[in-house]
Design a protein with these regions (language model features):
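Bacterial N-terminal signal peptides that target proteins for export
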Residues: 2-15
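Post-signal peptide N-terminal segment of mature Sec-exported envelope proteins
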Residues: 31-64, 79
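Mid-length scaffold segments of soluble, non-membrane domains
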Residues: 80-159
Length: 272
């Protein structure tokens, strides 16, 4: 029987109190400017070229050799395997109920779901609800910082970039890679396989970009909006949405005047 170490009690209590206090901080407002746009566009072009040359063809090949059921089973496995990331961040966000529910989901799918390949937990009213360290930092009140595009990673921000090392420390895929040193970096193959499954799931949404004038702006704004909804559990306040969309300080009267002038010009007969 493991002996109880009473000397750690005060420190553990203090740590828990600090975490709950931090989690109660006001979320910093979203940022709408893009001070590093020149650099970001270069990185976006690099990532787009890498995607077209290697990543997308690999995802397409993966879809060709797997059935929808097989892909769903594989996605279930990776989602369950990475559940420790969500559970720990639930605790850091002072959400013990979410942590308990996601722990139950992890246990059910790891056992009844044969290692996570199947998802009986969803049928038991324990749906997948993921979170990460970037959301944790946001709920602690850390400002978003400038938008950033990272090579081979894509859209992120100065705040969200810290989720990569933090979440990797909680990710069994990261544990596997860090504990091995195989030839040709083969220890990273499971992580690469996970990324391929994510890219394959995005193939169906590619038609959304067909009519997009500036894909860089589309990805940037879509990323910021998605993160905002994740931070607020799908219900961001109207003020945060207005700031994100740049409509918080709009002069409605000025916009109406501009619209009126535009309509007048269109109504004037053309002069030859």
């Amino acid at each position: 029987m493991r002996s109880k170490n009473t000397s750690t009690g005060p420190r553990a209590g203090l740590l828990a109190a600090c975490l709950f206090a931090l989690a109660g901080c006001t979320v910093a407002p979203p940022r709408t400017d893009d001070p590093w746009e020149k650099f970001n566009r270069k990185m976006y072009a690099f990532n787009d070229a890498a995607d077209r040359a290697v990543i997308r063809p690999t995802a397409v090949a993966y879809r060709k050799v797997t059935s929808p059921n097989a892909r769903r089973v594989i996605s279930n496995f990776f989602a369950n395997l990475r559940m420790p990331i969500t559970i720990v961040n639930d605790l850091l966000q002072a959400e013990p109920k979410d942590a308990l529910r996601n722990t139950g989901r992890f246990v059910v799918n790891s056992t009844l779901g044969f290692g996570g390949f199947f998802d009986p937990a969803s049928a038991m009213r324990m749906p997948l609800q993921e979170t990460d360290f970037g959301v944790t930092l946001a709920r602690w009140g850390l400002p978003e910082g400038p938008y950033l595009v990272v090579p081979f990673v894509g859209s992120t921000s100065v705040r969200d970039i810290w989720r990569m090392p933090a979440d990797r420390a909680l990710d069994p895929l990261g544990w596997y890679a860090d504990s091995r040193d195989l030839k040709l970096h083969a220890e990273e193959l499971p992580s690469m396989m996970y990324l391929v499954t994510l890219r394959a799931r995005g193939l169906d949404a590619e038609n959304l970009l067909d009519g997009v004038y500036d894909p860089y702006v589309f990805y940037r704004d879509a990323y910021r909006q998605r993160r905002l909804y994740e931070i607020y559990d799908g219900q961001p306040p109207a003020e945060a949405i207005e700031v994100l969309q740049g409509t918080d300080d709009l002069d409605i009267d000025a916009l109406l005047d501009e619209q009126h002038e535009y309509e007048q010009k269109r109504a004037e007969p053309e002069k030859y």
